[in-house]
A protein has these predicted regions:
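Detector for small/aliphatic-rich hydrophobic stretches
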Residues: 2, 6-12, 19-186
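Internal alpha/beta scaffold segment
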Residues: 293-314
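Non-catalytic, conformational "gating/processing" segments within enzyme and secreted inhibitor domains
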Residues: 41-48, 93-94, 133-294, 313-397
Length: 431
């Protein structure tokens, strides 16, 4: 069998901004080097949190073992609903890729420092009606579930040495999110950018080397999430059946593409007039769902009907024709999230995030950006994405199942055991 690799990296970064350093708000002791640390007891284990002092780089902070229980259906249903809500706010002819799983995790980590108004707004936009404790436990379980061979998710927190990281937040980040934590000199923006980009590169096997170019003025904290996949197809595409210069009938007219063919037994179904086929990976822990809507229906609208209905697919002989494609996307999501109900947590709202830092500051989400890349070919798939959240001081043959994607279609990568939607891509045009 020819191995077809998928490599997908999702990086979410949270950037906090303020105009003035806060006075230290926690008790602390100087260590032998004159640096200060605070220790908070959480579940019987001491968790080091940062306080105002000299920058020390990455700290040796160890959290509790991840919870290996089952991720709840309520939790994954929320992520999948969030994925669809984002899609509904994109243009019907949008072509691109994004990762709801990684974006949801970094936003849910941010929620741990939110006040009541900000938290309620974020929960509405994230479609999640769970306590912080339940959210944290399920994220711990998701990290554990995604920790198998070929899949990895990681988090990091970078804090300005002029500010004190809230001890309770530090414990949550370490115990439930396995976040690597460090203190840095944010007055030296280039050094912080280099440290952040090195962390991203290290946690994506070098596939994303530069998430940040520069830091906006008054940045005081970064929260980063990385999701990395490197898996082989269980059934490979036929290398001898790669057809060049065929027409893809996009919404902007016909474009010449290369189509790859695969035959064999797949899980597939006709749902609401369209076709869905599932492509499993060798570890049986993830699959890609390819959704071909009925004529005249956009991939966005069709995903709204079929997302989460993968269990309707049944085994049968099938044939898939899938384009070789490379997509690059950039989404500025602040106004999208505002439209989804997150306004009170965003710049201009009345919500605050007092639980992130021991600082007397009024902090809000100032920007949310996601950039993503996916490359699908007969030899493999590489996918990469970066997301930033800036926190600022407030102010059809009957007897043969054929899926021929020579017109707009969609792709979804799903973690089988948890049903978590890892990546979503829609293709309306191919340039």
């Amino acid at each position: 069998m020819k191995l077809i690799k998928i490599a997908a990296m999702m990086i979410c970064a949270l950037m906090l901004f303020s105009c003035a350093p806060a006075s230290p708000g926690v008790d602390h002791d100087a260590d032998e080097n004159g640096k200060t640390t605070n220790q908070q007891e959480d579940n019987g284990k001491l968790i080091n949190s940062t306080v105002k002092g000299e920058p020390s780089g990455w700290l040796d902070i160890k959290g509790e073992p991840l919870d290996n229980g089952e991720v709840s259906d309520e939790f994954t249903s929320a992520t999948n609903a969030f994925a669809l809500a984002l899609l509904e706010n994109l243009d019907d002819d949008w072509t691109g890729v994004y990762s709801p799983a990684s974006l949801a995790m970094v936003l849910q980590l941010t929620m741990q420092g939110a006040d009541e108004k900000a938290r309620a707004a974020m929960a509405e936009a994230l479609h999640i009606d769970m306590t912080n404790d339940d959210i944290n436990v399920n994220n711990s379980r998701l990290l554990s579930a995604l920790g198998s061979k070929g899949i990895n998710m990681a988090n990091a927190v970078m804090v300005s040495s002029e500010y004190a990281l809230n001890g309770n937040f530090a414990a949550i980040a370490a115990n439930f999110y396995r976040a690597e934590t460090g203190t840095f000199d944010f007055t030296d923006g280039r050094s912080v950018v280099d440290s952040a980009n090195k962390w991203v590169s290290d946690h994506t096997n070098g596939r994303i080397k530069q998430l940040f170019e520069t830091l906006p003025k008054d940045t005081l904290m970064l929260l980063i999430n990385a999701l990395d996949l490197d898996l082989n197809w269980k059934t490979s595409f036929d290398a001898e059946k790669v057809y060049k210069d065929l027409d893809f009938h996009g919404t902007n007219g016909d474009q010449k593409v290369t189509l790859m063919a695969a035959k064999g037994e797949f899980l597939c179904a006709e749902i609401d007039g369209g076709k869905v086929i599932l492509l499993p990976y060798e570890n049986d822990e993830c699959f890609m769902a390819v959704a071909l809507p009925p004529e005249g229906v956009s991939p966005n609208a069709y995903l709204g009907k079929v997302m989460g209905r993968w269990n309707e697919c049944k085994a049968r002989e099938a044939e898939l024709w899938l384009p070789k494609i490379e997509l690059n996307s950039r989404l500025e999501l602040l106004e999208t999230l505002r439209a989804m109900g997150m306004g009170e947590a965003l710049l201009g709202g009345s919500g605050n995030f007092p639980g992130l830092l021991d600082a007397d500051e009024f902090i809000q989400i100032g920007d949310v950006i996601q950039a993503a890349h996916i490359n699908v070919n007969e030899n493999g798939t590489q996918a990469a994405a970066g997301s930033g959240v800036a926190m600022k001081r407030g102010i059809s043959l009957e007897d043969k199942f054929v899926v021929r994607c020579d017109r707009p279609y969609a792709m979804v990568i799903v973690h089988t055991a948890t049903n978590e939607t890892l990546f979503v891509a829609t293709v309306n045009n191919i340039e």
